[in-house]
Amino acid sequence: LLDDGHRPEMKKLAEEYGVRYLSRATNEHAKAGNLNYGLENSHGDFICIFDADHCPQQNFITNTIGYFADKNVAFVQTPQDFYNLDSFQHRQGKNNKGLWSEQSLFFRVIQRGKDYWNAAFFCGSCAIVRRSSLESIGGFATGTLTEDLHTSIRLHKKGYRSIYMQQSMAYGIAPSNVEPFLSQRVRWGQGAMQVWKKEGILTGKGLTIAQRLNYLASVLTYFDGWQKGLFYLAPAIVLTTGIMPIEAINI
């Protein structure tokens, strides 16, 4: 249990369950620094990573470890699913059928496509990583707000493979209201820009053309806000000007 909060109650909880508790003297490099501290104070060949709110299923390791038979596989990422289905980012499907999360498109469609091009990236939780691969790039990447994306691109530059496994193996807590939701997305956007600048997605060495395009697409999604702005303004423009965005042509 890596605790950057230095909480006595967490230490006590870890002791009750026979879990090793680690807490740093400083919080340098935030989550990436905390993960690297855990890396330095452990010796396992593979590292399973879960955010504090994620609960893995008992068969997580047995279902993911087989991919590492390929010595070039650096990490296996699984979907990030949630058990608080009344969260801010969950919505009921059409005609009240099914339930989808704001992240469903990414984990059900986009990551699968990225996996085809060996460009699926580590998402910071619900994943298992090979220690030797991490050590070859100096551990979890620091210096940006998104250590997961940053670490992924460094591993891919080294020529390692990534695997995206579609089966849900862990469940966490999604943001319950708009404030933490926006804070999380702003952090992701800022981190993506930092990674772009530091790693040179288009110019840096080591990535295939397909990987460059996949990483570029992930970064450029944070420039899509203006499209939603126009979408929200469209009804007001139609009502005040009478100009329809689409004109039907009868033949």
Where are the predicted features?
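Catalytic donor-sugar/metal-binding loop of nucleotide-sugar-dependent glycosyltransferases
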Residues: 143, 152-170
